[in-house]
UniProtKB/Swiss-Prot annotation:
One of its GO terms (cellular component) is cytoplasm. The keyword Cell inner membrane does not apply. Binds 2 [4Fe-4S] clusters per subunit. One cluster is coordinated with 3 cysteines and an exchangeable S-adenosyl-L-methionine. This is Lipoyl synthase. SUPFAM superfamilies: Radical SAM enzymes. Gene3D superfamilies: Aldolase class I. Pathway: Protein modification; protein lipoylation via endogenous pathway; protein N(6)-(lipoyl)lysine from octanoyl-[acyl-carrier-protein]: step 2/2. It catalyses: [[Fe-S] cluster scaffold protein carrying a second [4Fe-4S](2+) cluster] + N(6)-octanoyl-L-lysyl-[protein] + 2 oxidized [2Fe-2S]-[ferredoxin] + 2 S-adenosyl-L-methionine + 4 H(+) = [[Fe-S] cluster scaffold protein] + N(6)-[(R)-dihydrolipoyl]-L-lysyl-[protein] + 4 Fe(3+) + 2 hydrogen sulfide + 2 5'-deoxyadenosine + 2 L-methionine + 2 reduced [2Fe-2S]-[ferredoxin]. GO terms for molecular function: 4 iron, 4 sulfur cluster binding; lipoate synthase activity; metal ion binding.
Length: 282
């Protein structure tokens, strides 16, 4: 049985509750939308929703994969909601966002793994929200670069795809996805030259600093210019336990190392998540 590791003081989370938080919650629920904020039990939901920002999750709320770090429901998804792209775009307008972030569940049940739905969502956001910048956090599309090209051609401002963890731990942490497939997706995005390629990773799953630095080097070699590094927090008892809580000082050390290695932007702190302060990553 895994030993329980006590959560340290620096991981105390600010709860939401101001007027903007309530307004954001109302808009999301009123359009029957899903957010990774709620499905992933994100520790920054209170802060972000209180600032009027949210990360929209398209493709429904049931994922075809079962990554052991993730709290999103797993199973057989419902058919795509054809109105979802418009609802997301309208919610962005109602929130008055200048920058929006969209992610999705994996839809391995669909012939195109949800790529066309992604494109429609990006197009609707552009149509309804002139001037809004957009980051998309995409799945690996099982390494189908023709599908990745569909996302690139839709012209979001940033395309993100998370490596999530170091090479050694990938088979036990992620489902279906492989480290090399994710690197290939990131390389393909970067080689397009049309937008920044961004990735993210979690710490506290048993990785070593040497392995973290290897991931940084691999990401840089693939052309990644933006990276986020945060503490893994076990969202439920069915998920992987936390092996170690990394100190804020260790995160700052990694941030400085990442800058020295050549990342244009690096966010590294215990509560950093892939879309946290995403407007800074353009």
């Amino acid at each position: 049985m895994a030993q329980h590791v006590k959560k340290p003081e620096w991981l105390k989370i600010r709860l939401g509750g101001n007027e903007k938080f309530t307004e954001t919650k109302s808009i999301v629920e009123g359009h029957c939308l899903h957010t990774i904020c709620t499905s992933g039990k994100c520790p920054n939901m209170g802060e972000c929703w209180s600032r009027g920002t949210a990360t929209f999750m398209i493709g429904g709320d049931i994922c075809t994969r079962a990554c052991r770090f993730c709290n999103t429901l797993t199973g057989r998804p419902k058919p795509l909601n054809e109105a979802e792209p418009t609802h997301v775009a309208l919610s962005i307008k109602l929130m008055g966002l200048n920058h929006a972030v969209v992610t999705s569940v994996d839809r391995d049940d669909l012939p195109d793994y949800g790529a066309a739905h992604w494109v429609k969502t990006i197009q609707e956001i552009r149509r309804i929200n002139s001037g809004v910048t957009l980051e998309v956090l995409i799945p690996d599309f099982k390494g189908r670069m023709d599908l990745v090209d569909m996302i690139i051609e839709a012209s979001p401002d940033v395309i993100s795809h998370n490596l999530e963890t170091v090479r050694r731990l990938t088979p036990s942490v992620r489902s279906v996805a492989t480290y090399d497939t994710s690197l290939a997706v990131l390389r393909h995005i970067a080689q397009s030259g049309k937008m920044p390629a961004k990735t993210g990773m979690m710490l506290g799953l048993g990785e070593t600093e040497e392995e973290i630095l290897e991931l940084m080097d691999d990401a840089l070699a693939a052309g990644v210019s933006v990276i986020t590094i945060g503490q893994y927090l076990q969202p439920s008892r069915k998920n992987l336990p936390v092996v170690e809580y990394i100190t804020p000082e260790q995160f700052e050390h990694l941030r400085l190392v990442g800058i020295e290695k050549g990342f244009r932007t690096i966010e590294s702190a215990p509560l950093v998540r892939s879309s946290y302060h995403a407007e800074r990553h353009l």
